[in-house]
Amino acid sequence: MNRFTKTIALAGLLNATLSISMVQGATTPEFPTRTVRMLVGFPPGAGVDFAARLVAQKLQEEWGQAVIVENRAGAGGNIAADAVAKAAPDGYTMLLTSPGPIVVNQSLMANMPYDPIKDLLPVTSVASGPNILAVRNDLPAKNVKELIALAKASKDQLNYGSSGMGSTPHMAAELFKMMTNVEMVHVPYKGSAEGVTDMIARRLDLMITTMPALMGAVKGGGVRALAVTSLKRNPALPDVPTLNEAGIPGYEFGVWWALFYPANTSALIVDKLHRSVQNMLRTEDVRAKLAAQNVEVAGNASPREFSDFVRKESAQWAKVIQTAGIKAN
């Protein structure tokens, strides 16, 4: 269980679900009565896209209305997040996203078109999991220590990919750089799938990205996994060490995926979405599908508890970005 999962699980145990208590006795609104849109800020093939399609399918089954996933990739997830922030707060437009557009980009990018804290309403987390550090299969480095040595000897010649500025892969690599005192060139893509394709084609040296995005290429031999970013080895890759084991003590980095509504969305609608997601996350079908992607269920917190977590994450990343001098390059 990673830091995110522990935090959310503890919050869920310590507090009764606030949103439910707020609306006890209230009448559930006639919602939805038409198609609901779920926006994703990254292309198909990303881990967040898998989570979105799974959640959308289950919501559609429960609600009896179409729930469609729209991929609006670009700007590190900001395009989709901005569209949701500016959408009518009627419950028919939601965002399923990874952390970047919510807790990172505001501290990294100038002239953000939306305020993630004021303009977006946290509803619930869905899943979380570790990342994999992988390299193209012909890179001379066979382990993390050799990769660090190669990066120092290459003097800015190695490049790493991400799914966009401020994305989880971007921040994971920047943290790696900071903790190992190496320099590498950042190559941002619209999504991790494009970067993985370039690694397989030997045009990109390395990525630190989600297990759903990389496992196919790792298993197929197109890329080589050097480490996982969790504190414990992952059962899907038992022979791959953690970055702690590989010589970077204290390195831990995971990704979470969560749902957000526009600010000022009715508490009744927020509660309905929250309860629907909690129900689906308890089913064996959903748990099995998430486990098959090597991610964990992470949806125990109420909207208020999850909102508190988001604010803390935002403050922590602002400090990391400032301390490390990370730039939007």
Give a label for each model feature.
Residues 1-33, 145, 329:
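Short, low-complexity disordered leader/linker segments with a strong preference
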Residues 25-118, 157-159, 181-208, 300, ...:
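N-terminal (or domain-start) structured segment
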Residues 26-28, 119-123, 244-250:
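Short beta-strand/turn micro-motifs at beta-sheet edges
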Residues 86-92, 99, 107-194, 243, ...:
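Hinge/capping helix and adjacent helix->loop/strand transition within the periplasmic-binding protein
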Residues 101-111, 170, 175-179, 206-240:
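A ligand-binding cleft/hinge motif common to bilobed small-molecule-binding domains
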Residues 214-283, 312-315, 320:
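C-terminal lobe and pocket-closing loops
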